[in-house]
């Protein structure tokens, strides 16, 4: 099959360390076929990806390149990822991370300029707080597009570490579990009114078999083979109509 970029065959190149360095595609056009680089990779001396170049418009002579640059801290944790459109020089997407001594992410700043609509673009910072057991207890999201408006979400847990509540100040979601610590219900409330309840069922092997949504009346059912591999998903709506995904 041929992709929308005209690529109908791929070849892979590796360096002496066995690290993937290039993906090449055979591009079919009216003038015949030519081999072009679809993506290239460079690494640091430890094998961590430093840079990826994606070549987007392979059918035209002036390939559109997106360069993805990755930087790491002294503990080899990703510190920053930047995706730049080399045709315009504009940073299209970027992520910056900070960590605590346990390598939990404490702050993430995200910029996403890919959406065409300004309202859909992203420029925000999210701060994460953890308890002594390393469980996430709070996130604070600062929206830099909207006068640094903030949104806080808090999380609570039971004594065995199951999340029992999520609260964003407007909506509260409570979680209950069965004796095997499998999620049994998720109840979403707005104010004092119940907005939605999801009910979960499992088979004797612990596979999730059903998810029922009381708000929509929809039930998702999951079937497994003898080796507990998912083999079928079916969705039944409130009118009893079933769609099967195999």
Language model regions located:
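Acidic/glycine-rich beta-solenoid
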Residues: 1-246
């Amino acid at each position: 099959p041929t992709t929308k970029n005209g690529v109908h065959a791929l070849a892979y190149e590796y360096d002496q360390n066995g690290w993937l360095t290039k993906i090449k595609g055979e591009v079919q056009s009216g003038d015949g076929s030519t081999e072009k680089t679809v993506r290239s990779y460079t690494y640091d001396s430890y094998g961590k990806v430093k840079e990826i170049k994606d070549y987007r418009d392979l059918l035209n002579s002036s390939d559109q390149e997106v360069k993805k640059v990755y930087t790491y801290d002294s503990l080899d944790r990703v510190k920053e990822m930047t995706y730049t459109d080399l045709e315009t020089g504009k940073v299209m997407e970027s992520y910056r991370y900070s960590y605590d001594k346990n390598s939990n992410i404490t702050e993430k700043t995200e910029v996403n300029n890919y959406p065409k609509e300004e309202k859909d673009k992203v420029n925000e910072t999210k701060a994460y707080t953890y308890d002594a057991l390393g469980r996430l207890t709070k996130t604070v999201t600062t929206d830099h597009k909207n006068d640094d408006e903030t949104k806080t979400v808090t999380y609570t847990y039971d004594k065995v570490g199951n999340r029992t509540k999520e609260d964003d100040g407007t909506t509260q979601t409570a979680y209950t579990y069965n004796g095997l610590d499998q999620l049994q219900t998720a109840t979403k409330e707005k104010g004092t009114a119940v907005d939605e309840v999801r009910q979960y069922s499992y088979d004797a092997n612990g596979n999730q078999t059903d998810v029922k949504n009381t708000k929509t009346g929809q039930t998702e059912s999951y079937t497994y083979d003898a080796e507990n591999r998912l083999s079928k998903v079916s969705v039944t709506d409130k009118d009893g109509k079933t769609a099967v995904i195999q």
